[in-house]
Curated annotation (Swiss-Prot):
Listed InterPro entries: aa-tRNA-synth_II/BPL/LPL (IPR045864), Gly-tRNA-synth_heterodimer (IPR006194), Gly-tRNA_ligase_asu (IPR002310)
GO biological process, one term: glycyl-tRNA aminoacylation
Keyword ATP-binding attached: yes
Record-linked PANTHER family: GLYCINE--TRNA LIGASE, CHLOROPLASTIC_MITOCHONDRIAL 2 (PTHR30075:SF2), GLYCYL-TRNA SYNTHETASE (PTHR30075)
Sequence intervals crossing the membrane: none
Record bears the keyword ATP-binding: yes
Name the UniProt record assigns to this protein: Glycine--tRNA ligase alpha subunit
Native species: Paracoccus denitrificans (strain Pd 1222)
Amino acid sequence: MTSPKDNQTAKPVCFQDVILRLQSYWAAQGCAVLQPYDMEVGAGTFHPATTLRSLGARPWAAAYVQPSRRPTDGRYGENPNRLQHYYQYQVIIKPSPPNLQELYLGSLAAIGLDPMIHDVRFVEDDWESPTLGAWGLGWEVWCDGMEVSQFTYFQQVGGHDCRPVSGELTYGLERLAMYVLGVEHVMDMPFNPPGSPIPLSYGDVFRQAEREYSRWNFEQADTGMLLQHFKDAEAECDRILTAAETDSAGRRIPMAHPAYDQAIKASHLFNLLDARGVISVTERQAYIGRVRALAKRCADLFVTTEAATLQAEDAA
């Protein structure tokens, strides 16, 4: 691993520069730089590179950008820092290295936030994801009084204890970049370098989509169809999980990942139904419980499959 001090550079000039610097920094620390998961998720944690790979004994180190959707947070592109579609940067390392906090501070320096100059504080705030049956001990990270990241040591995912414990970092990219670039409204933030042949702001790229999706999320999404799709995803997840573990050629191939895709779909459909206002307080808890049950069963299968794979490797 390289020293965080090697990455102390001048401040970025645009949103994509912040992302590129984080990618370069964590690649230099030995993380596999992955691509976003190709499904609608509410947070970077839902990526199987975090949720599933935090389970079991195999070492793991990955970093990636994840587009995330929270339909209820839509504000038609008018709120300065609240969006229904936004980006997170996710880092997951298992087992968690003893110097993870130092590495994190080095990542801030890499994007121009020198911890020796800025007031960086770790405010105790344990993390929980009810739909994933996951929780961890951790902190919100504040820089000069503004939350910029979440720092978590995973204790449990899908109802399974994390052994070894994974260290997870989540950066809110828009909020962090706005702070680094000194921008008051997310839509005014330069997306690419201002000196580019075609300079684009964040608003140039996303404002119209934010307006349209806000209307669709709150007013136009077909609730009857969404309810049926939720049932379909739930049923398909169950079908995959209960399918025979051997394929037509007699190979043992349980399907935790395809099943987990359906759990992700169910979670996003629940979020859309919540935005449409058709789920009561009582029903909300029941829906969360249904998604959590799916995620737990996917985790069960992943853990069982990995244990069998490791046993086979040891015997070979």
